[in-house]
Amino acid sequence: PDEAARKVKAVAAAVPPRAVLGIAGPGDGAYDWAKTRETFARVAAELPDLKLCLSTNGLALPERVEELKAMNVAHVTVTINMVDPHVGEAIHPWIFHDHRRHTGLEAARILHARQMESLERLAEADILVKVNSVLIPGINDDHMADVHQAVTARGAFLHNIMPLIARAE
């Protein structure tokens, strides 16, 4: 948090006008919540005009929504690559949730449920939501229309689909 706050201040001073601070890693900002919350608090105290944004996969997000609203986080970006757990198990073979590792279809079902809950809670809290999806040829390319329908129905104001471009090694 100290290093992040220093870097934000330096960039904000060098590149006006400043608009948005997004936390997107390392790791998942909603999962490593103590560091994310502290970074947001320090930056907001020193640069109150800066808008705050969180990027996450949504797994740890539902419990953070009320705090995000209280901290005046302007918007949240959630990466959602599937809404069918059968598709999801090929993309997300495992997750770590509730202090344990989940694998396969169970992992994809949990991730999907948590992502949809996150979108619904963010919409209820009037926090703008953008969804990013990675289109993976042969895995979820035929599934993007379903993803789009599900996320926009739950309040996403923008759905950004980005193709995975794999290169041979």
Give the role of each language-model region:
Residues 30-162, 167:
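Conserved AdoMet/S-adenosylmethionine-binding subsite of the radical SAM
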Residues 1-23, 30-39, 45-46:
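Conserved alpha-helical substructure of the radical SAM core
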